[in-house]
Amino acid sequence: AFAPSKVDSDRPNCSRYVQHLYMCTKELDPVCGTDGHTYGNRSIF
């Protein structure tokens, strides 16, 4: 069994995207969501 690492357990701060969703890019920078799914980047998460 694997223990979650610190990197995987950090939750992204989505507040910077709330008012500026149009600034979300499609750059690939995978992030693991708290739901166990991998998202393309923090903005898409």
Swiss-Prot record:
Key words, A-Z: Calcium, Glycoprotein, Secreted
The Kazal-like domain, residue ranges: 8-45
Major subcellular location class: secreted
Cellular compartment(s): Secreted
InterPro entries per record: Kazal_dom (IPR002350), Kazal_dom_sf (IPR036058)
Post-translational modification comment from the UniProt entry: Glycosylated.
Glycan-modified residues: N13, N41
Cellular component annotations (GO), alphabetically ordered: extracellular region
Annotated function: Inhibits calcium transport into spermatozoa.
Name of this protein: Caltrin-like protein 1
Organism per entry: Cavia porcellus
